[in-house]
């Protein structure tokens, strides 16, 4: 042991081995470790190892949570209320814009037209909401214009297109729509036009057609079968009546392409369908626009329901806020640094725009000792004169080009156009490109340099102005100078001067003798062919015929000048009377252009054929119904000899009937082979029975028995005896039957 210790003491220090890194052994985990080694610091962050709260603290936390929830609910309720008010205001603006689109102006209305007549004229285009006619209390007439408001905008547009220029009461109507800016929208709705444009833009996304004046007996299926000849119909909808039975006479059809829409409008507008002319036009509103015109009634939400909804919304928003405030990854946090905008590469073609302002004003790159004569003035680009020549400019002749007195700016030499190759951005510093020379002149020679630059610029400007295209005003002025034209005042002054000179010259002329006028000169009454030259007489004539020279006026009065003046006055009066008596040309009243359906395509012809069949069916149904009015029977046609003979027999005074009908005598179950013999035997007691007919209507359960006698007197006796008689427990009803119907085997009467 001693030897070993001695060896250790005598061993040199440099003989130690180098340190070797040994990996840390992986030890098995013993116990719970949270977040990191030891888990003490990080455990406090997540709430581990904290002391338990007392009941009072827990109550305070619950009260704080409840208060925070109440505040959140109040904020959400206020936000919902504000949003609801904004939606109501937006809906009201939309409704007002649609109301403007549904209104038309009708002008040039005759005084004989009343409101009911105007309503009948404009009712076929759609449901009318109101008609506003202004009345003059002094005259008791309207002011020849009115405002018609429809319930849908399409009806207003269709009425404007169809009724503008049409004649009503002897005058051509002027119908304009209120949806355009030319009609001067109301001052309280200046923001309606953008909404109208938005509505019309949305309507172009759908290929919808508006149809009005639809027959009440037609259904959506019938209307769809007529219009499906133009193309596939996506939707067909007729406006329902408030009572729930039938429709209101207008509706909408939606096609799947624009061609079908256009052909349907051109082919079916003003087409006779069921006795009414269809009115077909394009739609200017989307399908959901009518909900704004007639909004549904909104019931008030209970307070408890609104509070519960707000509480749920607050919880959802709190969860979203907690999820949004989670810590980001390093890559996400570093993204903002990478997203910062990088400096743009400077283009050699535009050096002045890429330099900062402070560099332009303060940087001195060239030597300030350079002589002024060696300063290079930037030449004008070769394309500059052409650009100025092509653009018209307003240039006054008195205006001269002068350089504004400003602070000296750096002069940049623009290089020739070339290919701009982007390069890497250099580090920030006062480094200018090699092709740019920026010189800030020294104040000692600033005046000389500025003067030379101004002289050269003036020379270049003079050369440019020679090739500048003159403006319109300059060309007119040069033309006026060349043609020696003058202004209106100068022309008037010249004309007045010329007239004054002529008057002065005439006043200076001596009095001469001239021939009398034909109306005053004496003529021989016996010579009718005497001309005015043969019978000329001399009279004193002054320069103004007694109007200018006083002396000549006195001389003319003595020798018949007054007669000449009276004759001239008479001529003037006759001319004025002739002008007044000219008959005024009556204003031609042009009838409006009639709109006819364009049946120039195969689809239109097929739709017309289908509509014709439907119209005939409707007419026959109306004529054969019991509720047919006299107006519907005005166009009744009689076809065939039998129908004509039947009608003429009804109109003539016919003989009495020999047939009696017995009703409610037997039931269908009582009919057997012995019934006819029993009836013949019973009815034979009152006369000679010729024929007995038993008509059994199984569908209705009625049985009618017809008995034909040889004389009408026998019919009266049988009727008096059998009417009201009991037979098999039934009360028999006997009455005379039409002889013609019985002869034609018609037992339905």
From Swiss-Prot:
Residues 323-388, 457-480 are annotated as: Disordered. SMART domains: RRM, RRM_1. Residues 102-176, 207-285, 658-739 form the RRM domain. One of its GO terms (cellular component) is nucleus. Keywords: DNA-binding, mRNA processing, mRNA splicing, Nucleus, Repressor, Ribonucleoprotein, RNA-binding, Transcription, Transcription regulation. It is found in: Nucleus. Changing residue 281 to D: In dh1127; reduces brood size, there is a developmental delay in reaching adulthood and results in a shorter body size. Does not affect pharyngeal pumping rate. Resistant to heat and oxidative stress. GO terms for molecular function: DNA binding; RNA binding. Its main location: nucleus. One of its GO terms (biological process) is alternative mRNA splicing, via spliceosome. InterPro entries: Nucleotide-bd_a/b_plait_sf (IPR012677), PUF60-like (IPR006532), PUF60_regulator (IPR051974), PUF60_RRM1 (IPR034209), PUF60_RRM2 (IPR034211), RBD_domain_sf (IPR035979), RRM_dom (IPR000504), RRM_dom_euk (IPR003954). Disruption phenotype: RNAi-mediated knockdown increases survival following infection by pathogenic bacteria S.aureus. RNAi-mediated knockdown impairs the splicing of genes such as prg-2 and tos-1 following infection by S.aureus. RNAi-mediated knockdown induces the expression of nlp-34, lys-3, irg-2, irg-1, M01G12.9, fmo-2 and cyp-37B1 under non-infected conditions. RNAi-mediated knockdown increases the phosphorylation of pmk-1. Residues 330-354 have a biased composition (Low complexity). DNA- and RNA-binding protein, involved in several nuclear processes such as pre-mRNA splicing, apoptosis and transcription regulation. Ensures the correct splicing of genes involved in immunity to promote longevity in response to infection by pathogenic bacteria such as S.aureus. NCBIfam families: half-pint. Belongs to the RRM half pint family. The third RNA recognition motif, called PUMP domain, is atypical and may rather mediate homodimerization and/or protein-protein interactions. This is Poly(U)-binding-splicing factor rnp-6. It comes from Caenorhabditis elegans.
